[in-house]
């Protein structure tokens, strides 16, 4: 009898051990299943947010094209594309974003314009109009004159196609090769204003001050739409006038702008204290329409976000062409 009881006790221990192992295995399987379900849910939400962002991009494109059709000769802040803080609810989330006119700012690539024959880069008074205007913008942002000249010429050397210094104030490969880590100048147009951070003299603080006033277009032309410069960007208008008008005058004119913008630039220039004819190069820069636009879009699904940055250009017959799309990823 004692032997039978011992065998029964051993059998019970074995059964309990097997049950314990089965519970542990079941618990692990349950944990893994929950983890896989969460992963699947996150992947599904990420893909859904991405396609929502793509849908928002398509909506922006349609809105821009419709605005072009409604008024092909004028682009202004009263049009549908310029709506601020728009929120569109969608299943399980929402869409937000904004569209920026990339001709309401200074095109950094316009600084790549070469000097005329016989003109020295060190002769500050004989530089191309975009160079003078950018230096004036830096002055409005309280950058010292010498630093402004250095920074302007460093950007010129970054965006031009050669490796020769534009002036004694510039910076080419020799300067950047001495940095840690070393790198070379692009010697081509900037693709984005983010490239400014790689240029000599552009600190994080200076970049933050410059960012609202500058852009990088695939062109060396400087064209600024006076209908989309905001009053808080009045320093840009002062710079385009090469400091021949005051900041208060520029703000006053921009604040009094008609809701649907000026139909022609003369309606604006006639209000400025300095006649247009006294500033060589300015007339060719001012415009009342735009061709380049940037959309920054955010799609939210649950706790997941997808970011998308798209740049469009207006082509022939007011059709919109995608120039660049940057996927900010899901987060």
UniProtKB/Swiss-Prot annotation:
Which residue spans traverse the membrane? 8-27
Instruction: Give the record's PTM text.
Output: Cleaved by prepilin peptidase.
Q: What is its main location?
A: membrane
GO biological process assignments: protein secretion
Q: Which residues lie on this side of the membrane: Periplasmic?
A: 28-331
Family the UniProt entry places it in: Belongs to the GSP K family.
GO cellular component term of the entry, any = plasma membrane
Which Pfam families does the record cross-reference, listed alphabetically?
T2SSK, T2SSK_1st
Q: Could you identify this protein by its name?
A: Type II secretion system protein K
Oligomer and partners:
Type II secretion is composed of four main components: the outer membrane complex, the inner membrane complex, the cytoplasmic secretion ATPase and the periplasm-spanning pseudopilus. Interacts with core component ExeG.
Explain the purpose of this protein.
Answer: Component of the type II secretion system required for the energy-dependent secretion of extracellular factors such as proteases and toxins from the periplasm. Plays a role in pseudopilus assembly and seems to control its length. Interacts with the pseudopilus tip complex that is critical for the recognition and binding of secretion substrates.
Residue ranges annotated as propeptide in the record: 1-9
PANTHER family named among the record's database cross-references: TYPE II SECRETION SYSTEM PROTEIN K, TYPE II SECRETION SYSTEM PROTEIN K-RELATED
Here the disulfide bonds are none
């Amino acid at each position: 009898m004692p032997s039978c009881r011992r065998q029964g006790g051993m059998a019970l221990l074995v059964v309990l051990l097997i049950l314990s192992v089965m519970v542990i295995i079941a618990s692990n399987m349950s944990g893994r299943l929950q983890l896989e379900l969460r992963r699947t849910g996150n992947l599904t939400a990420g893909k859904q947010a991405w396609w929502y962002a793509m849908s928002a991009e398509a909506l922006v494109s349609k809105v821009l094209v419709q605005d072009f059709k409604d008024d092909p000769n004028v682009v202004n802040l009263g049009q549908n594309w310029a709506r601020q803080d728009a929120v569109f609810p969608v299943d399980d989330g929402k869409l937000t974003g904004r569209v920026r006119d990339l001709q309401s700012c200074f095109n950094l690539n316009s600084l790549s314009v070469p000097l005329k024959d016989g003109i020295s880069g060190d002769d500050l008074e004989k530089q191309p109009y975009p160079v003078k205007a950018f230096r004036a913008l830096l002055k409005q942002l309280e950058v010292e004159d010498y630093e402004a000249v250095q920074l302007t010429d460093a950007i010129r050397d970054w965006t031009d196609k050669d490796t020769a210094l534009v002036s004694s104030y510039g910076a080419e490969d020799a300067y950047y090769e001495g940095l840690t880590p070393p790198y070379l100048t692009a010697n081509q147009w900037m693709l984005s204003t983010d490239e400014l951070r790689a240029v000599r003299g552009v600190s994080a603080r200076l970049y933050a001050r410059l960012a609202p006033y500058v852009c990088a277009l695939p062109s060396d032309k400087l064209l600024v739409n006076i209908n989309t410069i905001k009053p808080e960007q009045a320093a840009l208008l002062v710079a385009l006038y090469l400091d021949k008008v005051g900041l208060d005058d520029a703000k006053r004119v921009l604040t009094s702008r008609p809701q649907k913008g000026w139909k022609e630039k003369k309606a604006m220039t006639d209000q400025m204290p300095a006649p247009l004819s006294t500033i060589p190069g300015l007339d060719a820069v001012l415009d009342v329409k735009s061709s380049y636009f940037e959309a920054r879009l955010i799609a939210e699904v649950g706790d997941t976000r997808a970011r998308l940055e798209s740049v469009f250009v207006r082509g022939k017959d007011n059709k919109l062409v995608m120039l660049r799309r940057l996927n900010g990823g899901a987060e």
